């Protein structure tokens, strides 16, 4: 297990060589987005890995993007990943790259030890989403869903309660578990100002996702993963809270912290993230059982 802080001087090794398992092709890459975004957030990364010689696809999770009509569940999310992996053809090795909700989903899917999985890059997801702050946030989100956007005195109460939930989460040292930026999630579905969030899903996906996440231990999932795991965090992300525990739990892992980046590390520091991605894909090409960094 290794831990490092990324600096601009660190070059990315060329990952385009033949994988150690003898496959004629480098692993394909499946990108998995965070809460209330879509596969569109990965545009720069998809372009980057394709230039390195990897096939790639960025999926939309249930309740997001092209699957906005579906309810979010982990079981349905696993089906989406199954379909994406199978789309590259039988026997093709696949690497997962997930951010936040997508990172948690990727780790849980990888813990099932699917055939032909080469490795996982799990970004912004090293804090188990559990406890009273998360439950409070989920309950506030559910209230907004049931109320359909309360008005008058109810709206003011909801706003105050939302603020209390946010304060509790930040006091606990956490960003919104599973989501993109906590700030835009608290603002509701009408705040999609970022270019990569043209149509953010509504509050129902927050309640559904947090309900799904809160009942699991992602540390346990990390322990069950039998391929290399690269943990990538922005230095300013509160979700770094348990990164050392996640690093210690994994049988084969690396931790990279990107300076000056926050939760949405792939879009806040795309060049740095792409360098990390290149290094991770090169690592995934080595034979299982080799020492990390050897």
Task: List the model feature ranges, each with a label.
Residues 261-274:
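Catalytic histidine-centered segment of alpha/beta-hydrolase-like enzymes
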Residues 228-261:
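Conserved loop-alpha-helix segment in the C-terminal half of the alpha/beta-hydrolase fold
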Residues 111-112, 117-152:
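Flexible "cap/lid" loop of the alpha/beta hydrolase fold
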Residues 175-220:
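Hydrophobic, aromatic-rich cap/lid helix
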């Amino acid at each position: 297990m290794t831990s490092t802080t990324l600096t601009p001087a660190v070059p990315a090794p060329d990952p385009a060589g033949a994988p150690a398992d003898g496959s004629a092709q480098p692993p394909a890459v499946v990108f998995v987005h965070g809460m209330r975004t879509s596969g569109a957030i990965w545009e720069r990364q998809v372009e980057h890995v394709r230039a390195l010689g990897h096939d790639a696809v960025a999926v939309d999770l249930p309740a997001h993007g092209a699957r906005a009509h579906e309810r979010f569940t982990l079981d349905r999310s696993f089906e989406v990943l199954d379909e994406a992996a199978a789309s590259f053809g039988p026997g093709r090795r696949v690497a997962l790259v997930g951010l936040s909700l997508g990172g948690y989903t990727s780790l849980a899917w990888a813990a099932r030890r699917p055939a032909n999985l080469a490795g996982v890059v799990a970004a912004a997801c090293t804090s188990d989403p559990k406890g009273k702050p998360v439950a409070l946030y989920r309950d506030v989100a559910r209230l907004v869903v049931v109320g359909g956007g309360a008005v008058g005195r109810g709206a003011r109460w909801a706003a105050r309660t939302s603020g209390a939930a946010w304060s509790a989460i930040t006091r606990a040292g956490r960003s919104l578990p599973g989501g993109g930026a906590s700030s835009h999630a608290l603002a509701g579905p009408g705040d999609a100002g970022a270019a990569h969030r043209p149509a953010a899903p509504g509050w129902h996906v927050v309640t559904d996702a947090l309900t799904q996440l809160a009942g699991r231990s992602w540390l346990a999932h990390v322990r069950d993963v039998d391929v290399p795991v690269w943990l990538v965090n922005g230095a300013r992300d509160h979700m770094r809270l348990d990164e050392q525990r996640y690093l210690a739990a994994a049988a084969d892992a690396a931790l990279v912290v990107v300076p000056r980046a926050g939760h949405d590390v792939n879009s806040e520091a795309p060049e740095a993230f792409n360098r990390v991605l290149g290094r991770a894909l090169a690592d995934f090409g080595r034979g299982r059982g080799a020492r990390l960094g050897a």
